[in-house]
């Protein structure tokens, strides 16, 4: 046990961060005004500005937001003891729209609106995760979920408000990230070794993942990606 603890300590000491940026190549189609929110008698009043779709979040120097980065070949573990991740229903939208969690990690769904929502989870046909559909009234207690099986872009929707979607990627290790609005990301404290890092966006590259081989040392590693607007 002492030797195992020493080895774990040495590994933690030599762990490094993976940093990088995802850039979008090409011009995405214009985002559309969400007329369903605009014309809804309750949800429309929750927004002072026009609400548009957000399929492509493009920031400084064509940095692409909402890209999920995962690490293949990393040691698998459960996220049961990890801090919960929050998915809010605010302004009749799921916030954030894209997020990632670890298997076993708690996902806490809130309703910050003054209107009824229902949290409808629709897993892939062969994913192994279970469908769920739970109503959540204004001021109702948070609803907590956890998922046992990895899945890419697990769908959350609201049947009351058909424009509401979120997409949750479930990962079997703690080494993942979602790019910010400028395309930047960091995966922290990765054990030293060789890995395959994968970048995936729901729309860019036709939704297909792009991979790179990297080696992480105590100095970390860099992985930049360019994803394309489908032609």
Residues covered by each model-derived region:
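Bacterial N-terminal signal peptides
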Residues: 1-9
């Amino acid at each position: 046990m002492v030797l195992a603890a020493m080895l774990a300590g040495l590994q933690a000491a030599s762990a490094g961060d993976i940093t990088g940026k995802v850039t979008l190549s090409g011009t995405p189609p214009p985002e559309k005004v969400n007329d369903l929110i605009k014309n809804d008698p309750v949800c429309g009043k929750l927004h002072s500005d026009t609400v548009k779709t957000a399929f492509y979040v493009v920031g400084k120097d064509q940095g692409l937001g909402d890209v999920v980065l995962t690490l293949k070949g990393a040691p698998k573990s459960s996220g049961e003891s990890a801090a919960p991740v929050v998915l809010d229903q605010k302004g009749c939208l799921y916030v954030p729209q894209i997020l990632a969690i670890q298997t076993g990690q708690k996902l806490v769904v809130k309703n910050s609106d003054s209107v009824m929502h229902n949290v409808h989870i629709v897993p892939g046909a062969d994913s192994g995760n279970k469908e769920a559909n739970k109503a959540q009234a204004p001021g109702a207690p948070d609803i907590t979920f956890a998922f046992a099986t990895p899945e890419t872009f697990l769908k959350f929707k609201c049947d009351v408000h058909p424009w509401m979607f979120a997409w949750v990627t479930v990962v079997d290790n703690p080494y993942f990230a979602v790019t910010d609005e400028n395309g930047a990301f960091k995966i922290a404290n990765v054990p030293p070794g060789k890995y395959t890092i994968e970048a995936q966006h729901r729309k860019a590259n036709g939704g297909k993942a792009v991979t790179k081989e990297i080696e992480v040392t105590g100095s970390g590693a860099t992985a930049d990606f360019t994803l394309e607007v489908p032609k």
